[in-house]
A protein has these predicted regions:
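Catalytic cores of secreted or luminal carbohydrate-active enzymes
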Residues: 312-333
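Boundary at the C-terminal end of the N-terminal hydrophobic targeting segment
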Residues: 20-25
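Edge strands and adjacent loops of beta-rich recognition modules
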Residues: 165-169, 332-333
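Positively charged n-region of N-terminal signal peptides that target proteins for export
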Residues: 1-5
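Bacterial N-terminal signal peptides
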Residues: 8-18
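Recognizes extended acidic, P/S/T-rich segments that occur
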Residues: 55, 61-114, 124-127, 132-136, ...
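Accessory beta-strand-rich segments of carbohydrate-active enzymes
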Residues: 53, 58, 93-102, 114-118, ...
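Pro/Thr/Ser/Gly-rich low-complexity, intrinsically disordered linker/stalk tracts
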Residues: 26-60, 144-149
């Protein structure tokens, strides 16, 4: 009798485990989380965010499963993300099959701030049990917001004022600054017209070329965001910024073919570095009159031709730049 009861109990436990495994295999989990169709992006607009993911099954290939609800949670740190009461925003459980470009509907997010987020979904088994409970939370992802128009304190600088021709040699800007402690995080926001290349302590920050994107400079100027903490150290540090004309300053050259010409002004740059130290304090470094300008190694540049000299990229000394906003520019994007 005892043996029969034991066997019955074993079979019952096995059946429950099988049911549990089957139910677990029929729960979808968000994976490959994206913000604005990018993975862990830097410099996203804080009020126009969209969230996306793909659906992952614990036992592929899954069939007859679909999402019927979702929940998104955002926080300022991974520790806060794990505690619901400390979340910056929680969407709550939303009945929806959408998992593509879901708009953010919370309060205004802080500019130049890194946020962490995760999602979970509810699964419907179309030929079986119907709706079941929400599944596990996804692995965390992150995004970093851009600067808003009120957060810019840097000034546009140029080697010469607009309207004054300083010859074909393009400028290089140099600036030395000191960091008082070890760095926890550092965000660099930069634009250069028409194009720029930024070096920090001798290392190239810009991993792409022809930055920033071409735009109607009378209305919009684009800028880029970089995370540069690994390039910084306590004590003295140095910036070097190389500028190019791009499509911002295309001038006719005697004896050379020009598809089109047009100038919005002299090459110029705008840079803002926001540093947070390990002790919790912060510091900011901007382009201003303390920077030094030098004649750069590029002695002639057009969209289809470049002439480079062999002089050093950044020399000591130099002259202070002039402060000059882009002609007609109304906003940064």
């Amino acid at each position: 009798m005892m043996r029969t009861a034991s066997l019955l109990l074993i079979h019952l436990l096995a059946a429950l485990l099988c049911c549990s495994a089957e139910a677990g295999s029929q729960v979808l989990t968000p994976a490959h989380l994206n913000v604005d169709l990018q993975t862990d992006p830097l410099g996203v607009a804080s009020q126009d965010l969209t969230f996306s993911w793909i659906l992952h099954s614990a036992r592929p290939p899954a069939r007859d499963l679909r999402q019927t609800g979702y929940r998104i949670r955002i926080a300022r740190s991974l520790a806060q993300l794990a505690r619901p009461k400390n979340a910056t925003w929680d969407s709550g459980r939303v009945a929806s099959s959408t998992y593509w470009q879901i708009p953010y509907t919370g309060a205004a997010l802080e500019p130049a701030t890194t946020y962490y987020w995760k999602a979970q979904v509810q699964t419907e088994v179309q030929h079986g049990e119907g709706n079941i409970a929400f599944g596990k939370w996804s692995h965390p992802a992150r995004f970093t917001t851009s600067l808003d128009k009120n957060s810019w304190s840097a000034r546009w600088i140029a080697a010469t004022p607009d309207g004054q021709d300083d010859g074909p040699v393009l400028p290089v800007f140099r600036h030395e600054f000191n960091l008082k402690a070890p760095v926890e995080s550092a965000l660099l926001f930069v634009s250069g017209l028409g194009q720029y290349e930024v070096h920090l302590n001798g290392r190239n920050v810009t991993q792409t070329v022809l930055n920033p994107g071409w735009s109607d400079y009378r209305k919009t100027v684009f800028y880029d965001t970089y995370s540069v903490a690994p390039l910084l150290h306590p004590g003295p540090n140095a910036f070097g910024v190389l500028l190019g004309n791009g499509m911002y300053n295309v001038q006719r050259t005697a004896g050379r073919y020009s598809k089109f010409t047009g100038s919005f002004g002299q090459p110029k740059c705008l840079l803002q570095l926001m540093v947070r130290y390990t002790d919790g304090s912060s510091q900011q470094f901007n382009t201003d009159s303390s920077w030094q300008s030098h004649p750069g190694p590029i002695t002639f540049r057009r969209p289809t031709a470049v002439r480079i000299s062999m002089q050093p990229l950044c020399q000591q000394g130099g002259k202070p730049p002039v402060s000059t906003p882009p002609i007609g520019s109304r906003r940064l994007k």
